[in-house]
Amino acid sequence: NDPVVKKFQVHKDEVLRFAGEKNVKNVTRDEWKALVDYYIDKCIDKSIPEINSWGVFTSCNYLKKNFYSSKGAEIVQDMQNCWVGVNYNITVDGVTTNGGKFYSKFYKADLEGHEEEVLKERDRYLDFARNAVQAEPGEYTCILAPVTTAMFAHESFGHKSEADFMLNDKTLQEEWVMGKKVGSDLVSICDRGDWINHGYAPYDDEGTKATTCWLMKEGVLTGRLHDANSAAVLGEELTGNARAQSYQFAPMVRM
């Protein structure tokens, strides 16, 4: 009769998207080294005096999860990522800045051929280091890069949508009510775990199937993210957002 236990879903499923030929475990050490050497050859110019050090790195990870519950759930799913990045330390007039370009993909082949983008980013950082001036204090109209907009949305809105934060916070419960207008009509935000992208999880770490959860539609609050506990306490539906760092940690509500 426990309301939290009642919320737990029972699925029997196998979702192995990365177990075939493109599994990163099939990529040899020599192939990873060749990827690093490729970017060193294409993107490292030792004749630029302002670049005092640089680094090229790559890594990969494959994870297969088996989930079983006393209610009868049996779920097998997998996930993989691989990365490559080029970073530069740039010193101009005694001031050191650093920057570069980083790629996170599902398959090694998708990490190749980005040298033009890396060089463009390197030149942007060089231009900044050489020519940037102090901004005068004041109010400005700013055009934000997509990555900056995403970070603001993640930090200022996304974490507030994680329902476990409000369980013991009466003020937040009163402030963050469904139907409240909190943003522009141009802003709609959706959370999905089954999209093949960063954060992919067709089932969360409580065995809940991923859902399409509209957090905001045209600036109006329409949903929030739950695990079984927060959904039971607030009387709302599961969203599939109980995420555990690993089997050694309890799941938490996260985007």
Region spans (language model):
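Short acidic, glycine/serine/threonine-rich loops at helix termini
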Residues: Y62-M79, T96-F102, F152-G158, Y200-Y203, ...
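Short beta-strand elements
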Residues: I75-K105, L215-K217
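Dual-mode signal for accessory low-complexity, basic/Gly-rich regions
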Residues: E175-M255
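Acidic, His- and aromatic-enriched active-site or binding-groove loops in soluble protein domains
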Residues: E74-N87, S161-Q173
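Extended active-site and interfacial segments that coordinate phosphate-rich ligands
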Residues: W83, Y103-A109, K160-N168, N229-A244
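Broad gene-expression machinery/nucleic-acid interaction feature
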Residues: S53, E74, N81-G85, E139, ...
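Fold-independent oxyanion-binding glycine-rich loops
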Residues: V56-N61, N89-T91, A145-V147, D191-D194, ...
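Acidic low-complexity segments
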Residues: N1-Q77, D110-A150
